[in-house]
């Protein structure tokens, strides 16, 4: 068999960025949700100061008295264009993409001074948050019955909800919070983050939850169902469902989590959790190991691709002989790709779709290989999925390279980060929590609602 790498030996790789002004974020065709606590939000703040200093502060990028949103859209693009007329940006090349409102390296340096350029991880985070759309400071999203019309959330006299509970797309999460989509169900990431933050700053967590503090303490210990068993009498599902169907309690939890998203202590716990060996660390190494067995070295685009799949899907398939054979056979057929790494990403996307959100997963995956294929090479299904979801791409919009190798970081074990949540083995529920969740929510319909004619 001809080695896979040899098949690509005569094929030019993805074009390296020109020697001109390199792109950091290009939001000219679609807004980028980088996050209100990201380095890009700090850029917005500094850009507003730069504009104010040269008399071009209106319309504002960041209105007076407000915090930056981290959403890179029209206001930021127009702010960059106006700033090009300021003395502080006189060294930005005249032919720079910045003339269209693109955030480039020369614009960053002019506005941010000695602040380092955004890292590959920070750019990947911005792309992933643009997909997830669950920023710090936002209310959490409930995943119960999420595929149907949920009415007023009131059970009927017979104990069933006043709507049909459809949940095909995300039956095991129950509740989602924060930019990496932390859940209270299968992953228990919400429990981990709150427990870590509570032990570091008890008063902050206790103040946020108020009268729900006792419930929060029970929440840490309640049994979950794992990734496979998401229906029926699962204690943590009973607990969260009872909150979801009780408007005052629901608001208390939503307000608490939204408030805590503004806490530096909580955000640090969140970041440390995901960076740990128990979460991203081992999975990133597993993806890199798969690439190594295929004779590939992960690039910047690969790193973002891995991190996105970890967020939305999980670990890669097991590296058995069948998987490796299928990947190699697929890559050999991808002769229109200008990069073997892009071919591998497309092949993995096809080999390992999402169990319940296949179209969304495909749409996200396409954003990591779209730029490596000529027009007409991808299927109509791929293009429509990408264009109909969040049409961003790692190379075009985030300036990531499919040539530059990416470093897979060493990760610390969770045990090194402090207090570990208690064992989730409790079934302690109040009588109202046991009665408060309709059977139709505990046992949802695992399909999407029929289309309305």
For each feature predicted by the language model, list its residue ranges.
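Cell-envelope/ECM-targeting effectors and their regulatory/trafficking segments
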Residues: 6-452
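Sec-dependent N-terminal signal peptides
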Residues: 1-4
């Amino acid at each position: 068999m001809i080695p896979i790498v040899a098949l690509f030996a005569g094929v030019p790789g993805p074009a390296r960025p020109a020697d001109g002004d390199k792109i950091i974020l290009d939001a000219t065709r679609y807004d980028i949700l980088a996050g209100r606590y990201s380095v890009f939000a700090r850029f917005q703040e500094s850009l507003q100061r730069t504009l104010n200093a040269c008399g071009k502060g209106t319309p504002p990028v960041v209105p007076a008295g407000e915090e930056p949103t981290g959403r890179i859209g029209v206001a930021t693009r127009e702010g960059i264009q106006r700033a090009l007329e300021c003395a502080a940006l006189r060294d930005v090349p005249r032919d720079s993409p910045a003339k269209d409102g693109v955030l480039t390296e020369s614009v960053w340096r002019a506005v941010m001074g000695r602040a380092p350029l955004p890292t590959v991880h920070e750019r990947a985070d911005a792309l992933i948050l643009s997909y997830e759309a669950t920023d710090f400071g936002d209310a959490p999203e409930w995943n119960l019955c999420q595929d149907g019309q949920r009415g007023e959330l009131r059970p009927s006299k017979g104990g069933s909800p006043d709507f049909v509970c459809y949940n095909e797309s995300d039956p095991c999460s129950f509740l989602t919070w924060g930019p990496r989509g932390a859940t209270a169900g299968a992953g228990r990431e919400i429990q981990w983050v709150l427990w870590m933050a509570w032990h570091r700053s008890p008063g902050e967590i206790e103040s946020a939850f108020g009268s729900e503090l006792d419930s929060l303490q029970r929440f840490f210990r309640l049994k979950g169902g794992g990734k496979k068993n998401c229906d029926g009498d699962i204690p943590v599902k009973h607990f969260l469902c009872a909150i979801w169907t009780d408007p005052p309690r629901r608001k208390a939890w939503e307000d608490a989590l939204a408030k805590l998203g503004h806490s530096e202590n909580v955000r640090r716990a969140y970041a440390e959790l995901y960076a740990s060996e128990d979460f991203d660390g081992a999975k990133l190494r597993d993806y890199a190991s798969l690439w190594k067995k295929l004779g590939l070295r992960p690039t910047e685009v690969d790193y973002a691709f891995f991190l996105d799949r970890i967020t939305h899907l999980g670990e890669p398939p097991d590296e058995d002989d069948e998987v490796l054979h299928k990947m190699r056979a697929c890559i050999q057929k991808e002769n229109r790709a200008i990069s073997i790494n892009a071919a591998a990403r497309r092949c993995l996307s096809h080999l390992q779709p999402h169990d319940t959100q296949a179209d969304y997963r495909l749409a996200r995956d396409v954003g990591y290989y779209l730029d490596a294929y000529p027009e007409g090479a991808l299927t109509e299904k791929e293009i429509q999925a990408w264009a109909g979801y969040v049409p961003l791409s790692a190379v075009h919009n985030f300036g990531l390279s499919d040539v530059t190798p990416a470093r897979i970081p060493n990760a610390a074990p969770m045990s090194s980060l402090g207090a570990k949540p208690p064992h989730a083995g409790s079934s302690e529920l109040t009588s109202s929590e046991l009665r408060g969740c309709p059977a139709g929510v505990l046992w949802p319909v695992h399909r999407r609602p029929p289309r309305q004619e």
